Amino acid sequence: MDDFTGLLARDFGLKPQGKSAPMASQSNSSAADFNTFASSYSFATAAGKKSDSLPVFDDPGRDGDDLLFKDVFSGPPPPKYGSSSGDSRSPSAPAFDYDAMFKEPKSKSASSMPVYDKPVYDDEDVFESIPELKIPSTSSQSARFENVFSSISSSPTKHRKQNSSPFDDLMGNNLGKKGADSDREEKGSSIFDDLIPGFGRTSSPPSKRTTSETTNQSEKAPYRTAETSSNVEEDPFVVLEESESTPREPSRTDPLDDIGKFNSRKTDHSSVHGGVFVDIDPLDNLGKPGPDMNSKGKSHLRPPGNISGSQSPPVESPGSYHSKKVSFEDFLEPHNMSTPPPTNSNGSFESSDDVWLTVSEIPLFTQPTSAPPPTRPPPPRPTRPIKKKVNEPSIPTSAYHSHVPSSGRASVNSPTASQMDELDDFSIGRNQTAANGYPDPSSGEDSDVFSTAAASAAAMKDAMDKAEAKFRHAKERREKENLKASRSREGDHTENYDSRERELREKQVRLDRERAEREAEMEKAQEREKEEREREQKRIERERERLVARQAVERATREARERAATEAHAKVQRAAVGKATDARERAERAAVQRAHAEARERAAAGARDKAAKAAAEAREKAEKAAAEAKERANAEAREKETRVRAERAAVERAAAEARGRAAAQAKAKQQQENTNDLDSFFSSISRPNSAPRQRTNPLDPFQDSWNKGGSFESSRESLRVPPGQPENLRKTSSVTNIVDDLSSIFGASASQSGGFQDVDGETEERRRARLERHQRTQERAAKALAEKNERDLQVQREQVEKDRIGVTLDVEIKRWGAGKEGNLRALLSTLQYVLWPECGWQPVSLTDLITAASVKKVYRKATLCIHPDKVQQKGANLQQKYIAEKVFDMLKEAWNKFNSEELF
């Protein structure tokens, strides 16, 4: 059942003892909220505790020992009316009075001040079920559990009398512990300070003094008169100057112990009379009693005889209200005093600069939570600049506002312990040690409550910081005024004040030094934490960068893989398409080749048939032609022989007739010239030699004509004289011819008839010119005759060679052309088989000769390659010339047939 304590208490209303408690009423929303918080942390009540008030959230029929549901702000018992027993309640008391929440009840026997109404709350401790937090009670009439802010409106003496901690119900045994109450009473300190320093303090506890100092104070008691009225309101921010003006004794090492003892500071002046902000406390009107109560239940006016060094604060004289408000600079002045300074108690208040705070400006965040406390402390408070007088030494005060408590903190009775430091220690949630030296018990529920209280304290601290900044200016001004007033009324207390001032300053310097060290440590820790956070941030950034880089690499790899896959897919597709195309092309080529092969086979078969037929026909024709040629040759030979014989006979007859005519003419002429002069006779003889001759005839003109292959008629025509000659030339020529003929007949030498003859009477120049012309003529004639003879011999030799080569080449050419007569495509496609390699012919496939245009183009190329003239120009031999002539003749014949059969 121990594990289900909170569960049963929260869900079923059962306490750990097994009793059933009725659920709280839900009519009030505020009460329901507090009941929810109280029910989640249900603890057992302490034995022997009696509640004088009827709790709002508990069963009215149950006594104080059986309370189960507590409010976290467990209020004090309601005020007693009419009797000291406190059994009756005011019928007009509200169920949840916020104004009375921050007030502290006063019993009739302890105070003569009017009693204020209190809200009806459960007065049991929230944490009472924890054994370590059970605190024995010293008075049955005092409230066991009071309001969490009861110290705001209650006096320390009241707490000392009741021996109850204001925060027992909030923080348990650790913060509201009463184990050292006797020691605190002996030291004259308040049992516990308020949660917010300065709230609810009506009197300052006395400082720890010797008997002599107490005696001096008693002797100087007449200086003090009656205190201010009992309803004087206290300044809640007096701690701002008290924490600076009071010395501190580092007797406690537990920083959280200070939080539960906020009213344990010892000062020389009352919080009502010594605070700077005495007239601007926004919470003073919340029902706080005016008069200060000591531990003996005395009235606010304390006579000198009742002053003790352990309990009573120094008696204040009239007019000491401003005298105790000493600024922080005054505490640092180096002068000694043996007696405390007089205080002002004239009861006057400065209302010209009143600044009021409302409850809404101090939010309280105390909602229940199960979250762990914060892992890091709140941000440090900003240091406040401290004004320094002209003559006071420079003391380091930068560490005054520290958030890290040290082991040398002031004890409960130390008047110099800063209440703001206690609040700081409480806000950061540090572990503290109880007054008896034992550590506080820790559990999950304590951590939750502790975190909520820390959050509330932090919120209040923030509000106090804002108010402190708002009131700093007024504080400094009033400090100066109060200092002047206090110094004017110091009188005989100068020595005691100087000694106490020196002591306070020394302690303050020591505490400031310690605080500076703590701040330095705190700064170092913060720097280390900051460095760790920066390193962690850098590490996280590096990891993020690595993650981003890895993601980028993965994305790039994925994209590369996708691109590679796409490229591979495209390549495969292209390969497939290429293969399909190649296959289709191969199929087409194969089909074309098959068609061509079939065409070639058909063409070859047809060509073979045609070739066979043509060969047979050719053989027949050749045989016929050979027979006819032979017959014609025989006939021609016979005719030629007959013609030669006839020509010879005619020549002989003509020669005989010519000789006879020449002889007859010679005789007749001789007879006629006998009568002429001899000169004329010789001149007529020599004239033909000088006359131009048409041709040079050989000895036998008929024989010469025959040798040249000419006929008899051509020789006769050559002897004729052109018709355009004059008559005398004709006669001369005839005479010359006759003479030549006679000379040739009679064996005259050709040199005499063809040689150069001198002419009488011609000049030397003409003779030389005629001689040169005669020589050139002879040379040209001889050269032309030699060339003609050479050509004739060459033609004869070539013809003989052709006849010899034709015997072998004709067979090859006929074999090549067999079956291809008239088929130009077949001849052109097989032309490389008959031509010689040096001709430059490139073989042509039959598939390239399908169209007529391609056939014509290839034929033109073949013509340029094997034309006889082209072949002779290239310097071909006789065999190549013969082949070219034969092939060209066959191609030309086939071309003529191709043109006649096909259209372009």
UniProtKB/Swiss-Prot annotation:
S-S pairs: none
GO cellular component, one term: Golgi apparatus
Locations listed in the record: Cell membrane; Golgi apparatus, trans-Golgi network; Endoplasmic reticulum; Cytoplasmic vesicle
Region (Disordered) location: 46-99, 150-731, 749-776
Main location: membrane
Segments of skewed composition (Low complexity): 81-95, 201-215, 661-673
Sequence ranges of Pro residues compositional bias: 370-383
Top-level taxonomic group: Eukaryota
Biased composition (Polar residues): 394-419, 674-697
Ranges of residues in domain J: 839-904
Membrane topology: Peripheral membrane protein
Compositional bias per record (Acidic residues), positions renumbered to this chain: 232-244
Coiled-coil spans in chain: 456-663, 762-804
Swiss-Prot/TrEMBL keywords: Cell membrane, Chaperone, Coiled coil, Cytoplasmic vesicle, Endoplasmic reticulum, Golgi apparatus, Membrane
Job of this protein: Promotes uncoating of clathrin-coated vesicles. May interact directly with clathrin.
Assembly with partners or alone: Interacts with SH3P1.
Protein name: Auxilin-related protein 1
The organism of origin for this protein: Arabidopsis thaliana (Mouse-ear cress)
Gene: AUXI1
